[in-house]
Amino acid sequence: QHQISFPFKRYQIQAVWRADRPQRGRYREFYQCDADVVGSGSLVFEAELMEMYDRVFKILRIPVKIQLNHRAILESFAMHLQRPDLFIPITTALDKLDKTSTDEVAQDLEKVGLTTSEASWILAQIQNKKLDDFHFHENSTKGVKDLQTVFDLLRHSGLNNEVIFEPTLARGL
């Protein structure tokens, strides 16, 4: 009677606070919507969440591109280079690419311990936005297959906004 049934879906909209010092134009307190599905590994729920985001932005009349990535693809950069210990620093550096230059990200990658050639290899990989070209490690191949499944599920769903693969997206890790 008092047990949660799975998969469990939830969402909430509430005030949240930044722990760090807010940058210019940002507030310490702001509203955020979180949506989660727990208790299932089915990719159907990933597609369902993409459909939900699409509906919300349609209702708000805000055209967007919904970006999608897979943790296994991000992990594969470090694993391919045999540097699994640098997964988080590599991912953090890549996630800055929408805000800073490629040269600065290359410097950040070298600061965390990658060689110039290793940093260059990663940056060359992410220039390619075609999902089929990310089969350079068994981990990335799993991520590619999972994302292809999600894109296949979304193909006939009538989305209003475009869902795209973005290999540098790493928010929330």
Question: Could you say what each language-model-derived stretch is?
Answer:
Residues 1-63, 105-173:
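Positively charged, Gly/Ser-enriched RNA/tRNA-binding surfaces
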Residues 49, 70-73, 90-93, 105, ...:
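Internal, well-ordered alpha-helical segments in soluble enzyme and binding-protein domains
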